[in-house]
Amino acid sequence: MASMKKASQETALVLRTCSADLTSHGGFQWPDKIGAVVEAPDWKKDNKCGHGLHGWLFGQGDHGCSSTVGEADAKWLVVEVGLSDLIALGGKVKFPRCTIRHIGDRASATQFLIANEPRAAGVAVIGATLQAGDKELCQVGAYGTATAGDEGTATAGDKGTATAGDE
C-alpha cells in the first residue's frame, strides 16, 4: 500500500470504484498508476451528474451512484482533489481533475483513505471494516463491516454487517 502525507486543508481524499479494467461510466479509462494526474475530457462546471470525474468525498455518500461498488473484482481508487474543484451532487461529488493516491481492493482503499484523510474519521465510509472496543460506537457505510465490543454499538449501511457484543 502506498503512503502519503495526510490530506491538506486545501485538498480532500475521495473514494471511488471502477471496473476491474479501470474503466468507468461511458468507457472512461483510469490510468493504473499511483501519482497520475487525471483530467475529465468532458468537464462542465455545473451541478448535474456527468461531465466530470465522480466519487465519494471522505468516502461517504450514496453507494447507488456506482454500478461497480458491489463487484468482487472492482478496483477501488482513492484520489486527491482540490477542495475548490469539488461540486456536491447529493451522495457524491464531481471534479475536473485529481491525482490518484491509491489503487486496490475495497479493504486496502478504505484503510488507505481512513489513514490519510482525517475527515473520514467522522463519517460512515463506504466499504470500510472497523472495530471498536467495549461501550464504543463503530459506524461504516454500505458494504462495510462494523464490530463493537460489549455494550457497544455497531452500525453498517446497506449490504453491510454490524456486530456488537452483549455481555
Where do the PLM segments sit?
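Short, glycine-biased loop/turn motifs at secondary-structure junctions and
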Residues: M1-E167
